[in-house]
């Protein structure tokens, strides 16, 4: 014979190793596994480990030329999910050597590239990843991080304020720039290109960049504050994306933007490197994330996409609001907000954090709260997100009955009132409405905003509960 036993394999003999002690250098994954009826959980967990590492469906001759023990993924623990029938969390350990250094792309191709179509599984969701320090250190991470951004902007002790310019499609570049100017002049720190504003026939990117730069410089001169507009550099090719970032740098503006999931991790990491080398901040939008993360039992949880972004690089990322029109459970959201901002995050299952994560001083990312929020939400947002965040009010600025600049004034007054109240020791959760009401006596712009949005609520049952 040829010296090996041919035939289809029983995965659990090789890949289910409950006695395995994880190494500090292993990448650890927590999968939510729903096996097909009749498939035992150990076999399903082992299949995940095999298919996302060294395994193939049958024994092959070339297995003899390598050391399976050194390179295989191992399913080292399986636990049933409370309250779910036939659903398990399978923990898998991957040896570090399976991954190319500094490549989020390769990490995802390996871990989630193939296994999600596997027939023995009804559904599969990647809930969390533990990135070991040895692998973290191969990534540059965010171009600048939270502290450097505050120093560049000279803004401390409060969240930053933003606004997405609407209508997102159809404005000419000059009118777009005018809307940017009014918002920044009224008191916002940032305005934002919508994620799907790239370079369309009604407004080419170069014209937009030029008029937005003009708006930034004019509003800076008039307010004495540093201003920015997230110029969306996302493009159809990496070369074109970098060309747009170069033009932004030539204009001297502080920040550009990228859609990291539609643009892809390879493009994103290149852009992040360019931004660090050239002193540009990088704002990240997560367009397409719900395609990947919305289903409770299949796909990838956003906390994994957030960790991946911190590795690939970005200074801001959208992270749900807890209070607005887009869903996001409070504890779960705060869990991945901490994963974005903090250096060391303890395992905490109540917040969806399956592993302790040590980022070994990789810079942090500012979470961006955006979507359906307005002045009445300000106390809750200040309380929930704290100072290190960007609060973005699109309609909540531009929908003001008196126009953009008064809308911006209303938001800035509301924010400053909340920060002052908090610093004076007041309870934002309990006295929030009172704080806003008091402030509106001194600000007609805020009073008008309070009138418009007094009854708006977006209330649905959350989808993604643990």
From Swiss-Prot:
The answer on whether this UniProt entry bears the keyword Magnesium reads yes
The N6,N6,N6-trimethyllysine modification is found at 5
Q: Which cofactor does it need?
A: Mg(2+)
GO MF term set = magnesium ion binding; monooxygenase activity; ribulose-bisphosphate carboxylase activity
First-tier enzyme category under EC: lyase
Q: InterPro entries, per this entry?
A: RuBisCO (IPR033966), RuBisCo_large_chain_AS (IPR020878), RuBisCO_lsu_C (IPR000685), RuBisCO_lsu_C_sf (IPR036376), RuBisCO_lsu_fd_N (IPR017443), RuBisCO_lsu_N_sf (IPR036422), RuBisCO_lsuI (IPR020888)
EC numbers: 4.1.1.39
Any Gene Ontology biological process: photorespiration
Under Pfam families, the record lists: RuBisCO_large, RuBisCO_large_N
Q: How is it modified after translation?
A: The disulfide bond which can form in the large chain dimeric partners within the hexadecamer appears to be associated with oxidative stress and protein turnover.
Q: Which residues form the active site?
A: 166, 285
Q: Which Gene3D superfamilies match?
A: Ribulose bisphosphate carboxylase, large subunit, C-terminal domain, RuBisCO large subunit, N-terminal domain
Q: Which residues does the annotation list for site: Transition state stabilizer?
A: 325
What does it do?
RuBisCO catalyzes two reactions: the carboxylation of D-ribulose 1,5-bisphosphate, the primary event in carbon dioxide fixation, as well as the oxidative fragmentation of the pentose substrate in the photorespiration process. Both reactions occur simultaneously and in competition at the same active site.
Q: How does it assemble?
A: Heterohexadecamer of 8 large chains and 8 small chains; disulfide-linked. The disulfide link is formed within the large subunit homodimers.
- To which protein family does this belong? Belongs to the RuBisCO large chain family. Type I subfamily.
Q: What is this protein called?
A: Ribulose bisphosphate carboxylase large chain
Question: What species does this protein belong to?
Answer: Coriaria myrtifolia (Tanner's sumac)
* Organism lineage: Eukaryota, Viridiplantae, Streptophyta, Embryophyta, Tracheophyta
């Amino acid at each position: 014979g040829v010296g090996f036993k041919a035939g289809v394999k029983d995965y659990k003999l090789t890949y289910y190793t409950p006695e395995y002690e994880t190494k500090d250098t292993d990448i650890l994954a927590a999968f939510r596994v729903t096996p097909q009826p009749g498939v035992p959980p150990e076999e399903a967990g082992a299949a995940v480990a095999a298919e996302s590492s060294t395994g193939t469906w049958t024994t092959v001759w070339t297995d003899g030329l390598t050391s399976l023990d050194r390179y295989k993924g191992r399913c080292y623990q399986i636990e049933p999910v409370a309250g779910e029938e036939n659903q398990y969390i399978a923990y898998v350990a991957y040896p570090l050597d399976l991954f190319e250094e500094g490549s989020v792309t390769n990490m995802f191709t390996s871990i989630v590239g193939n296994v999600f179509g596997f027939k023995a599984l009804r559904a599969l969701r990647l809930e969390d990843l533990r990135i070991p320090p040895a692998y973290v250190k191969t990534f540059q991470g965010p171009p600048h991080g939270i502290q450097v951004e505050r120093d560049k902007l000279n803004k401390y002790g409060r969240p930053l304020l933003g606004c997405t310019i609407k209508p997102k499609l159809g404005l000419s570049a000059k009118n777009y720039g005018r809307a940017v100017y009014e918002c920044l002049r009224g008191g916002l720190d940032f305005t934002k290109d919508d994620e799907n504003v790239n370079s369309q026939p009604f407004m080419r990117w170069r014209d937009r960049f030029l008029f937005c730069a003009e708006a930034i410089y004019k509003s800076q001169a008039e307010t004495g504050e540093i201003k920015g507009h997230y110029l969306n550099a996302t493009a159809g090719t990496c070369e074109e994306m970098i060309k747009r970032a170069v033009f932004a740098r030539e204009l001297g503006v502080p920040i550009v933007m990228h859609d990291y999931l539609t643009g892809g991790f390879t493009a994103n990491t290149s852009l992040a490197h360019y931004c660090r080398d050239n002193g540009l901040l990088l704002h990240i939008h997560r367009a397409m994330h719900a395609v990947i993360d919305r289903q409770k039992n299949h796909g990838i949880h956003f906390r994994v996409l957030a960790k991946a972004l911190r590795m690939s690089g970005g200074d801001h990322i959208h992270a749900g609001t807890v209070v607005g029109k887009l869903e996001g459970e409070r504890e779960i959201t705060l869990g991945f907000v901490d994963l974005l901002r903090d250096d060391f995050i303890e395992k905490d299952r109540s917040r969806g954090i399956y592993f302790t994560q040590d980022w070994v001083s990789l810079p942090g990312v500012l979470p961006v709260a955006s979507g359906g929020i307005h002045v009445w939400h300000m106390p809750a947002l200040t309380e929930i997100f704290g100072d290190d965040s960007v609060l973005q009010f699109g309609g909540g600025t531009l929908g003001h009955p008196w126009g953009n600049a008064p809308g911006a004034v209303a938001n800035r007054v509301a924010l400053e009132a909340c920060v002052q109240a908090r610093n004076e020791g007041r309870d934002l959760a309990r006295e929030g409405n009172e704080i806003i009401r008091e402030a509106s006596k001194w600000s007609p712009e805020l009073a008008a905003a309070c009138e418009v949005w007094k009854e708006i609520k977006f209330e649905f049952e959350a989808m993604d509960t643990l």
